[in-house]
Regions:
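Generic alpha-helical secondary structure signal
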Residues: 54, 81, 119-122
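Secondary-structure transition/capping residues
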Residues: 38, 42, 67, 82, ...
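Conserved small-residue
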Residues: 20, 60, 86-87, 128
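Phosphate-binding/catalytic loops
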Residues: 94-148
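Structural signal for conserved beta-strand scaffold positions within catalytic alpha/beta enzyme cores
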Residues: 43, 88, 106-109
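Conserved active-site segments centered on acidic
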Residues: 2-77
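Mid-chain, well-packed structural core segment of small domains
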Residues: 72, 78-101
Length: 148
């Protein structure tokens, strides 16, 4: 059987936080850079803040990733249903984060950057980058395991 000409379904990773204004937006930006072929990133929040945190935009631009055109989005059931992997960026309140009710959610527990110093937001950015790189590497490994 030839796989030539067949298109595999694009796999989706959903990054979730409350406001979808910084952590999940940075993760989406990094995933777009590091994702293996065939993967798509989406970020969303339970109570979107509106504009993306300008400090998050700034610290991402410092390393050559532009998230200024990304939009804060409310999480929808179809996003959850259609996601292959879901990352909870760090919300711990079950009332504000439905990701806590879903099985197979990866918990990252990343500190909220809102109101933090520029240096602290850079540290948070770097933490997110390392986690996204590891996630991308893990996805490559798992996609290389073929079951017959």
């Amino acid at each position: 059987m030839s796989l030539q000409g067949s298109r595999a379904k694009e796999r989706t990773v959903l990054f979730v936080c409350v406001e979808n204004a910084a952590r999940s937006q940075m993760a989406e930006g990094f995933f777009r850079k590091y994702a293996p072929e065939g993967y798509l990133a989406i970020s969303a929040g339970t109570m979107p803040a509106g504009p993306i945190n300008p400090v998050a935009i700034q610290v991402m631009k410092e390393i050559g990733i532009d998230i200024s055109e990304q939009k804060s989005k409310i999480i929808r059931e179809d996003m959850i249903r259609n996601s292959d992997d879901m990352i909870n960026m760090g919300c711990v309140d079950k009332q504000s984060c439905p990701a806590l009710f879903i099985n197979n959610v990866i918990e990252w527990g990343i500190e909220e950057p809102k109101g933090k110093s520029l240096e602290k937001v850079r540290e948070i950015r770097d933490d997110i980058e390392q986690r996204v790189k590891q996630l991308a590497a893990d996805l490559v490994k798992s996609s290389q395991q073929v079951n017959y």
